[in-house]
């Protein structure tokens, strides 16, 4: 195991524990966010350059509110991927919908484990409606594998729903037969 992998696993374990320990208090969240910022700054060269251009680094930041936020256009720059790993190691890539421009942003993952865990934890923590019988007005994740929203609802479907109906068909239209038979 190399140094980068060791750091990555440590950061992931801290985030995973924070997700499981919800609600997290402000001080613990601040400590976690500063740790993630330091990791991202150290391992994500594109983000490090962005922070450097702003005159910021982990030694100057004491509160998570002050962590430099990337503009959404930064995710559209293929030549500067926002990852802490080689892009070729991504097991999942989500794309933005592309509604604002023709260039779609990219968000790469080596694993969606934390992402999936946070979806279920947030759903339960926020006391969102019972999902045991779910109607999804979006494409099934198999039809739209680059959609983070479809992925999120797929996680809800797999982990919380006893019955799921996906109402958008492959052409992007509402499947009226499924809708009528479900209601």
Describe each model-derived feature in a short phrase.
Residues 3-4, 14, 18-20, 54, ...:
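Active-site phosphate/ATP/adenylate-binding loop shared across adenylate-forming ligases
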